[in-house]
Amino acid sequence: MTTGYRRLHILVEGQSEEIVVNNVLEPYLQNQGWMVTKSIVTTKRPATGPASHGGVSSWTKLKNEIRLLLRSSDIHTLTTLFDFYGFPTDSPGMNDQPSSSPYDRVQHVEKSLTSTISDPRFVPHLILHELETWAFAAAEQLGWLFSGSDLAALLLKDVRDAGGPELVNDGPNTAPSKRLARYCASYSKTNDGPLAIADLGIEGLKAQCPHFADWLAELDSRT
C-alpha cells in the first residue's frame, strides 16, 4: 500500500454492482492506497429532467461516458464493472473474438476497448460472465442465507462441472443469473448476492476467479 492516495473511479453497470463496490471492493481498494469514487453508467440524457442510469445499451453511449469521465485530470485510473454476458455487440473486439477459452475472449475484448479509448488511465474490466458469477463463488455463503435449501449444492455442482465460477457459461438459459433464478425464486440480486460476496471476501473471490484476480493485480500495480 502506498501512503499517497490516488483517485480510482469505477464506472458500474447498475445498482447491484454499486452495492458490491461499496461493501466489498472499496474497503480493499482503500487499503491499497486508492481514493475510490464510482458512478452508474448513464443510459439516457434527456434535454430536460434527470438522466437515466443502469444497463449498457450500446458502445457509442458507453464510449461517450468513458471519455467524458476521462476529461477529469483528477482521475488517476478509470476502470469498469460490466457483465461480459450481454455486453453490446457493437463494442470493439466483440465481433472478432478468438475461438478459444472464455479468458482469451474477454481479454481480447478488454484489450480492444483499451486500444479504442487510447488513454493510459483506462483499465476496462468485464466480469466473466456476469456479477452473479461472484455469487456462484460464494455458493457456501449463499447456502447459509438459504439454510434448509439445496441452493449451495446446486451452485457447487455447476462450478465443478464448469471448472470454476467464471466458466459457468453465458447462454440465455444457462447464464449464472438465469440459473440462480431457476434454483431459488426468492433470490435477490441486490441483497442476497452482495451479502454472500461480502461474506466470502476479496481473497476468496481471487482464489476462485482468476480474471477478477488479474484485474485487482493490475489496479494494485498502479497505486
Show which residues each predicted segment covers.
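Non-catalytic terminal and connector segments of soluble metabolic enzymes
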Residues: 52-59
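C-terminal accessory helical subdomains adjacent to catalytic cores in phosphodiester-
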Residues: 1-5, 18-49, 63-223
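Catalytic nucleophile-elbow at a beta strand-turn-alpha helix junction centered on a G-D-S/GDSL motif
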Residues: 10-19
